[in-house]
Amino acid sequence: MGEAGIEVVENLLPSLRVELDLDLVIAQAENTTAGKGISLSDFERLRAAGVDFCTGGNHSLFLKEIHEAMADPLQPIIRPANYLSKTVGLGYKYIDTPDGPVLVISLLGQIVGRDADKPVDNPLQIIDKILKSEKSNKKVAVVVNFHGDFSSEKFVIGHYLDGKVSAVIGDHWHTPTADADILPGGTAHITDVGMCGSLDSSLGVKYSDIIPRWHDGRQTKNQLEKEGRMQFNALLVEIDPKTAKAIKVKQIRKIIAPSS
């Protein structure tokens, strides 16, 4: 979430990649640049920090400078696949790993989709079409990032895709949920993975801006918090390359105290 989130990733991810021997790092990047969209330079910063692939959400297309990269099959960044078909960019792409290719898909929930920067289709119907056209090899790992508001919707798509994909990782709340699990069909699932950025804030925004809005309805501008404690949230998923099913899942949460 904003500059604070980028700096947390830059500070922690390089050592985590080594410590955990990670094959693939996927980041939800729609709030990277000032909390809305992602610029080319910030995309490059995340890549330099160790992020292999970036998924999207309702602000993915806010900055036009990233559109060309999203439309390039060789650039590891996507927008939600259930944007209407004529929308710029791609909603799923493959990326190579030491254990073979991984298909990464980004989806937007129907509730948050009402406020998206572009119109959206039904995510369940779209994922059906994608899997039918792309998953001829059932051993290919498939990771789905689901950007949605309602926990009920996130539960539904997780269980709908159980056994069809390797992982369904929810986000959008900026707050991690304590429900990381491997579903009966072998699909890793979490309702919300959380965010990287300010901890002492309202989802990354300064309390001084948010409290007056809730207290007496004053209209205030969202300013991102850059001071205080920071947080790093992620989900570690181990996938069996022979079956493309999840065999281990673990939440990662680190709190960074402000430097004195």
Briefly describe each language-model feature range:
Residues M1-S260:
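Acidic, metal/ion-coordinating pockets
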